[in-house]
Curated annotation (Swiss-Prot):
Localization per record: Nucleus, Nucleolus
Gene expressing this chain: tif412
Modified residues (Phosphoserine): 67
Principal cellular location given in the protein's record: nucleus
Protein name: ATP-dependent RNA helicase fal1
Record-stated family: Belongs to the DEAD box helicase family. DDX48/FAL1 subfamily.
Motif (DEAD box): 170-173
Residue ranges that the Swiss-Prot or TrEMBL entry lists as coiled coil: none
Binding site for ATP: 65-72
GO molecular function annotations of the record: ATP binding; ATP hydrolysis activity; mRNA binding; RNA helicase activity
Role of this protein: ATP-dependent RNA helicase involved in 40S ribosomal subunit biogenesis. Required for the processing and cleavage of 35S pre-rRNA at sites A0, A1, and A2, leading to mature 18S rRNA.
E.C. number: 3.6.4.13
GO annotations of cellular component type: catalytic step 2 spliceosome; chromatin; cytosol; exon-exon junction complex; nucleolar chromatin; nucleolus; nucleus
Length: 394
């Protein structure tokens, strides 16, 4: 599976980076290898085969690769190989733009490190500060968190940074956007000089790449060409709906197709998510929804339900577009086309994870045609009109 990905993806990469074709060749700790195989990996994906070794060597790394190609496992394996488990102090700090992603990364680190007795805590807003303090005082090898809460814990001196040797910026394009930029700089200033920095994202626009110069020293770059970025094995379609008002009926017509496996429907605003959820329920369709204004507990419960397959159709904002991995999702619908073309790949990458087949359907009004063309041009891709037999493809 991962071999196919390796063959099909061409990387624009620093000169001295060789691909390693198996996890055994990486000289990883025995207990870590056990965790990797137990997690279901057999051979490394394109980004894993190149980046893991460089991270283990202690090099600063900038890695850009498609959604669903195992980027989280790439830096998690690098961390687990590099930390000293006999020192129960924070040695690796992972920053993510959303709480859900921070928790998911924590789960990946714990799963891969299952045989290593690794301590990893998710330090995120919307949860108990007291619990964070207790966990951090106990000692955590790895902290996965959102910038606001991590900054708070460092300032309170509960998150001690003296032994931190690795900083990971996941979904770096979002993290280095205006919203988080200052917090990231603040956190970086608290870290020991010479901290290794790993920057990871599916999209790394030029301005973000330039900004990474502030954090990195002579980084190894592992970059996928932009025209390689639309996802292998993902079918992309559009439905011409002419007017905004016609989208709802179109979605109702598609509902039976949505529930064949699991589907995610993206809207551009929280209000739209609430409105569409209510309309669908009034029409007797079963849906769940999630956005950033919901309390963390509620968001966790909804995610849990969706992961377990108890709910099959999730309506949400872009909060869900960032790296959330639910294996059964094979259909993504852009009820609204994303306002930011970089988010397109994050959204459609929710289907067809790690090389499974997936389908993305874009609802396009007359006003949206220009945005669709822009997305096609940006990713050098062609988005066709949806065929009648869409149910056979999901």
């Amino acid at each position: 599976m991962a071999d196919e990905i390796m063959e099909n993806v061409e990387l624009t990469t620093s000169e001295d980076v060789n691909a390693v074709s198996s996890f055994e060749e990486m000289n990883l700790k025995e207990d870590l290898l056990r965790g990797i195989y137990a997690y279901g990996y057999e051979t490394p994906s394109a980004v894993q085969s190149r980046a893991i070794i460089q991270i283990c060597k202690g090099r600063d790394v900038i890695a850009q690769a498609q959604s669903g190609t195992g980027k989280t496992a790439t830096f998690s394996i690098g961390i687990l190989q590099s930390i000293d488990l006999s020192v129960r102090d924070t040695q690796a700090l992972i920053l993510s733009p959303t709480r859900e992603l921070a928790v998911q990364i924590q789960n990946v680190v714990l799963a891969l490190g299952d045989h290593m007795n690794v301590q990893c805590h998710a330090c995120i807003g919307g949860t108990s500060v007291g619990n964070d303090i207790k966990k951090l005082d106990y000692g955590q090898h790895v902290v996965s968190g959102t910038p606001g809460r991590v900054t708070d814990m460092i300032r309170r001196r509960n998150l001690r940074t003296r032994n931190v040797k690795m900083l990971i910026l996941d979904e770096a394009d979002e993290l280095l956007n205006q919203g988080f930029k200052e917090q990231i700089y603040d956190i970086y200033r608290y870290l020991p000089p010479g901290t290794q920095v790993v920057v990871v994202s599916a999209t790394l626009p030029q301005d973000v790449l330039e900004m990474t110069n502030k954090f990195t020293t002579n980084p190894v770059r592992i970059l996928v060409k932009r025209d390689e970025l639309t996802l292998e094995g993902l079918k992309q379609y559009f439905i011409a709906v002419e007017k905004e008002e016609w989208k709802f009926d179109t979605l109702c017509d598609l509902y039976d197709t949505l529930t064949i496996t699991q589907a995610v429907i993206f809207c551009n605003s929280r209000r739209k998510v609430d409105w569409l959820t209510e309309k669908m329920r009034e029409a007797n369709f079963t849906v769940t929804s999630m956005h950033g204004e919901m309390p963390q507990k509620e968001r966790d419960a909804i995610m849990q339900d969706f992961r377990q397959g108890n709910s099959r159709v999730l309506i949400c904002t872009d909060i869900w577009a960032r790296g959330i991995d639910v294996q059964q999702v094979s259909l993504v619908i852009n009820y609204d086309l994303p306002a930011n073309r970089e988010n397109y790949i994050h959204r459609i990458g929710r289907s067809g994870r790690f090389g499974r087949k997936g389908v993305a359907i874009n609802f396009v009004t007359n006003e949206d045609v220009r945005i669709l063309r822009d997305i096609e041009q940006y990713y050098s891709t062609v988005i066709d009109e949806m065929p009648m037999n869409i149910g056979d493809m999901v």
